[in-house]
């Protein structure tokens, strides 16, 4: 298990690489703001800890080992992409120098903090618990890498300081500091601030390190969302102030706990669930409900544009199986995307025409004027459909009534449901008589991995952003996960007026959507970086005409 890789650690690795390789030195007199921190036990220790049996067996699969190999190589290529441009090929010698270090970040225990100075000035302090042999190897490899970049390696510039060495380029303010304290190797990148370094050394020598004990968690992450927004100068005000998540083993499963601290107060009073069971046709592979989360829901992309008058106080979402068996043979047909969401509305708000008009304004004339798109509505039938060629998905919104309540419903595949086959009563029973419950999500994770992998590939095809196909080890990895991952349940519970408690029990610590997003991200040429325009520019690709 020494080479095993824990999927939730990808977030921690990004945090490490982002600050470790992209920091710029700031003035020592500038105040630092904590942006995030982590504590990871390392796969070597996790393999000896209780629980997570499904995850541990998954990590021994050949497809998982291939993904780990790909991950380590991409992380080792990250510095060159940062310094010389995203998408450029990394220097093979520098990649070879860093690959064992990236593998050690997965295998050994580490703690780190990222601080912001003034955008884009960052400071990373990281400590990793290594054997003497490994500390020597890191010393040699990091010296070689700095020298290969043309950085000057020299003794500490601070008099009386206990670092082994420092390195900096000749023409910029970047600074790297390397030192040792007992079993821990300490590295800082960025601003020349010594306080944190000396505090950590003191804590290590007094056996009080790491400074934030995690009580047996395999991985702990804390992100200061509000501080990140202020640091980056982002105009929008985040709905979330702080998030902390902890992962640990629990029998066959991974237990995920934590909290979300919101900027606005959460309403204590709740209405009873309003669920139109005649629309939710069994079988389903996922079922979600939310209520009284308007401060969070309104921060999602497009929500305020589509719901200018009022954000729905509650909603129910579900999806049906995407795998479709061809009745004429064993081969499967193209997957269906039977994903739906519905929410109650007042009688005078049941018309979907306002949503249709807002969608036009949000999507823009250039998108809707494309010859492959047609947004049409029927006021009498109270529905609107976006017809896209080819027609794998046909997003729609419609209004309807169930009993005395009026609803609106949206989905990716327009369907007229005329029969009643409600989901199991036990599933609906999970959300009843639970006054603190604000969000509930159940899924068959393997089925959802299949669904989202194909949905993301469809998006890549329609918008010319590429697809993750069978020649990628990540494709084989997600196919393997389809057959290994079962039930997952996530809950958000109101703890106090500004805190939501996170609870999840799953096989991998992640939902199918999260797994598919991470696989798609790792597949990108620029991983672990993010190419901003690829997330903001959405134009339908021109399809090539078939050859005669």
Placement of each model-derived feature along the sequence:
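Long, C-terminal catalytic modules of enzymes
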Residues: 413-538, 542, 547
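Bacterial N-terminal signal peptides
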Residues: 12-24
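Broad, structure-driven detector of short, well-ordered beta-strand segments within folded domains
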Residues: 103-112, 173-178, 237-251, 311-323, ...
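Positively charged n-region of N-terminal signal peptides that target proteins for export
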Residues: 1-13
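A conserved glycine-rich beta-strand in the N-terminal activation segment of trypsin-fold
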Residues: 172-235, 392-474
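Short, intrinsically disordered low-complexity segments
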Residues: 161-187, 371-412, 538-548
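Structural boundary/hinge residues at secondary-structure and domain interfaces
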Residues: 29-166, 170-171, 214-237, 255-372, ...
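Extracellular/lumenal glycan-associated surfaces
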Residues: 125, 129, 188-191, 343-344, ...
């Amino acid at each position: 298990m020494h080479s095993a890789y824990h999927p939730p650690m990808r977030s921690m690795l990004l945090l490490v690489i982002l600050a470790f390789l992209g920091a710029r030195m700031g003035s020592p007199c500038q105040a630092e703001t904590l942006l995030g921190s982590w504590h990871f036990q390392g796969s070597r220790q996790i393999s000896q800890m209780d629980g997570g049996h499904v995850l541990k067996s998954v990590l021994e699969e050949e497809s998982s080992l291939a993904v780990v190999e790909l991950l380590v190589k991409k992380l080792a290529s990250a510095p060159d992409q940062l310094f010389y441009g995203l998408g450029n090929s990394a220097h093979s010698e520098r990649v070879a120098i860093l690959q064992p270090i990236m593998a050690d970040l997965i295998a050994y225990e580490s703690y780190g903090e990222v601080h912001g100075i003034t955008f884009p000035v960052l400071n990373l302090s990281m400590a990793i618990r290594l054997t003497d042999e490994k500390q020597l190897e890191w010393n040699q490899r990091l010296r070689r890498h700095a020298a290969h970049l043309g950085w000057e390696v020299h003794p500490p510039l601070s008099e009386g300081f206990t670092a082994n060495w420092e390195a900096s380029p000749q023409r910029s303010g970047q600074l790297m500091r390397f030192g040792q304290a007992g079993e821990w190797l300490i590295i800082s990148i960025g601003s020349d601030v010594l306080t944190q370094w000396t505090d950590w050394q003191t804590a290590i020598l007094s056996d009080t390190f790491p400074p934030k004990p995690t009580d047996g968690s395999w991985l702990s992450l804390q992100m200061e969302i509000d501080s990140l927004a202020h640091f980056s100068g982002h105009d929008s005000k985040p709905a979330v102030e702080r998030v902390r998540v902890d992962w640990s083993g629990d029998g066959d499963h991974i237990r995920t706990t934590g909290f979300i601290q919101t900027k606005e107060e959460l309403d204590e009073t709740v209405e009873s669930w309003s669920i139109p069971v005649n629309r939710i046709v069994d079988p389903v592979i996922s079922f979600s409900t939310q209520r009284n989360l308007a401060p969070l829901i309104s921060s999602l992309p497009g929500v305020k544009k589509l719901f200018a008058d009022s954000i729905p106080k509650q909603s129910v979402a579900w999806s049906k199986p995407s795998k479709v068996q061809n009745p004429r043979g064993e081969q499967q047909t193209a997957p269906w995307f039977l994903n739906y969401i519905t929410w109650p509305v007042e009688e005078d708000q049941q018309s979907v025409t306002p949503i249709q008009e807002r969608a036009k304004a949000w999507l823009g004339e250039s998108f809707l004027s494309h010859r492959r798109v047609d947004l049409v509505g029927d006021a009498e039938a109270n529905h609107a459909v976006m017809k896209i060629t080819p027609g794998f998905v046909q997003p729609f919104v419609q209004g309807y009534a169930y009993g005395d309540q009026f609803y609106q419903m949206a989905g990716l595949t327009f369907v007229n449901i005329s029969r009643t086959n409600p989901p199991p009563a036990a599933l609906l029973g999970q959300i009843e008589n639970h006054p603190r419950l604000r969000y509930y999500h159940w899924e068959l994770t393997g089925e959802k991995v299949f669904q989202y992998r194909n949905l993301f590939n469809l998006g890549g095809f329609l918008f010319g952003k590429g697809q993750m196909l069978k020649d990628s080890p990540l494709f084989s990895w997600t196919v393997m996960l389809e057959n290994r991952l079962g039930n997952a349940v996530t809950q958000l519970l109101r703890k106090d007026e500004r805190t939501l408690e996170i609870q999840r029990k799953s096989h991998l610590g992640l939902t199918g959507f999260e797994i598919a997003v991470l696989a798609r991200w790792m597949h990108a040429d620029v991983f672990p970086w993010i190419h901003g325009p690829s997330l903001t520019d959405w134009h339908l690709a021109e399809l090539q005409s078939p050859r005669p």
